[in-house]
């Protein structure tokens, strides 16, 4: 058995895997005219040649993808200041901009990149002319410069530059919206290339498709990757032994644990938000039913029963209930089951089918695949009012996965007859596509905060 595993499947530890620059290239397909204007001024480079990473471009792209910001193109900026004293506040506010990011990069004595950046409130700067004052602890009137919202310096290696740019995006996003940014997160997904020696590959990349790493490759299908809450493990379904099995793998060491290998179907793993339990779907007794495995004791509890098929479990934020897809009413719809008393309630009513549901981190909405006269598209349902909003116009949407801050959704769709990954903001106003260069891409899973 072990020999066959080794011949069939390679587990590749991330530290030694091949890294691609951007196997998934994000292409914006629909922007937002009404998003908040912001100025991301090109960072000044005090050195020879070009910087290994265009920090300001990365920040600008991050904020634009959030759907909440509309970065001003460099050629339309009234100026490109690098110091606070150089800022013409009025010129920026006339454009409707209320905040800008400026920065500088230089090499320090240790050969590292010293990155300095500021987030500046240009409205406050215009009002105070950058000279606001207040009393300090001793009662002395001092210059506060409170229009500078963030002022930070970091010393970085070449490999750290792109990651730090995402960190800046997170800081700016949270400071201006009050919500945590999700730009330092990853996505896991399955790439299928029928012509490859190992057609099925489980990969991980930064949320924007960069720094892709191969985690696992197989001659048999890999399905349904799901992140653990600590971002260190993936649960997934493998057919490496000519039958479906559920594994949990540490993405850093490659160590695996077999969780389920029952007769017939083993699928749809999903970690609870505390990481203690794993919801899975088995058909060992006939129809598809949902079970919960305690990962410490390995005790398994059956959650659903009956003749209907019940699948695609997803945990509520409080871990006290699950939503799932069931055909008990004739066609797939989404239900909620209380894990305490087993009571079940149907949640979706609009559309002939609703499936693949996930609950937003704040517990207010379900994001799901909704079937209507126009096809299969992503939709969002308000759990309090029941109101449904269709978010996408792409073809044959499936496998939605919500960013940990609830601001974006990644999913699989069809583009030019190929499975590709797409993104949509939670309000449906911003859309982007991440076409792969080497195969069909399916089953995306957005990581937790890292």
From Swiss-Prot:
One GO biological process term: cell division
This protein's UniProt keywords: Cell cycle, Cell division, Periplasm, Signal
Coiled coil spans: none
Signal sequence annotation: 1-22
GO cellular component: periplasmic space
A Pfam family per the record: TolB_N
Main localisation: periplasm
Subcellular location(s) per record: Periplasm
Function: Part of the Tol-Pal system, which plays a role in outer membrane invagination during cell division and is important for maintaining outer membrane integrity.
Subunit organization: The Tol-Pal system is composed of five core proteins: the inner membrane proteins TolA, TolQ and TolR, the periplasmic protein TolB and the outer membrane protein Pal. They form a network linking the inner and outer membranes and the peptidoglycan layer.
PANTHER family membership: PROTEIN TOLB (PTHR36842:SF1), PROTEIN TOLB HOMOLOG (PTHR36842)
Family: Belongs to the TolB family.
Name the UniProt record assigns to this protein: Tol-Pal system protein TolB
Name of the gene encoding the protein in the UniProt record: tolB
């Amino acid at each position: 058995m072990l020999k066959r595993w080794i011949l069939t499947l390679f587990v590749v530890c991330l530290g030694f895997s091949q890294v691609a620059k951007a196997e998934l290239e994000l292409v914006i397909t629909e922007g937002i005219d009404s998003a908040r204007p912001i100025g991301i001024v090109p960072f000044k480079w005090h050195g020879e040649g070009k910087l290994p990473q265009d920090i300001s471009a990365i920040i600008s792209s991050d904020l634009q993808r959030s759907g909440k910001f509309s970065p001003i193109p460099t050629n339309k900026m009234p100026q490109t200041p690098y110091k606070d004293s150089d800022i013409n506040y009025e010129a920026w506010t006339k454009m409707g901009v209320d905040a800008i990011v400026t920065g500088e990069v230089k090499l320090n004595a240790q050969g590292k990149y010293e990155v300095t950046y500021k987030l500046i409130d240009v409205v406050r700067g215009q009002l105070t002319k950058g000279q606001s004052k207040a009393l300090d602890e001793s009662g002395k009137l001092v210059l506060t410069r409170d229009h500078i919202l963030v002022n930070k310096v970091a010393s970085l290696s070449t490999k750290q530059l792109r990651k730090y740019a995402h960190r800046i995006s997170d800081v700016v996003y949270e400071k201006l919206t009050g919500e945590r940014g999700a730009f330092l997160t990853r996505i896991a997904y399955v790439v299928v290339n029928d012509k490859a020696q190992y057609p099925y590959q489980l990969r991980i990349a930064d949320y924007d498709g960069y720094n892709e790493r191969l985690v696992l490759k197989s001659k048999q299908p890999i399905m349904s990757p799901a992140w653990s809450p600590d971002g260190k493990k993936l649960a997934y379904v493998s057919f490496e032994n000519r039958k479906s099995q559920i594994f949990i793998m540490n993405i850093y060491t490659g160590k695996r644990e077999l969780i389920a290998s029952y007769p017939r179907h083993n699928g749809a793993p999903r970690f609870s938000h505390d990481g203690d339990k794993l919801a899975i779907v088995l058909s060992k007794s006939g129809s598809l039913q949902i079970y919960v495995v305690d990962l410490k004791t390995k005790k398994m509890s059956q959650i659903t029963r009956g003749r209907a098929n019940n699948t695609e479990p997803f945990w509520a934020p409080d871990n006290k209930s699950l939503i799932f897809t069931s055909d008990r009413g004739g066609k797939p719809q989404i239900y909620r089951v209380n894990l305490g008393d087993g009571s079940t309630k149907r949640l979706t009513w609009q559309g002939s089918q609703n499936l693949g549901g996930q609950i937003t981190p704040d517990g207010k909405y379900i994001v799901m695949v909704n079937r209507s006269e126009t096809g299969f598209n992503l939709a969002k349902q308000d759990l309090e009012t029941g109101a449904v909003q269709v978010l996408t116009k792409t073809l044959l949407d499936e496998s939605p996965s919500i960013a940990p801050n609830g601001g974006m959704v990644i999913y699989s769709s069809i583009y030019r007859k190929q499975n590709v990954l797409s993104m949509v903001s939670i309000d449906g106003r911003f859309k982007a596509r991440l076409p792969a260069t080497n195969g069909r891409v399916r089953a995306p899973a957005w990581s937790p905060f890292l």
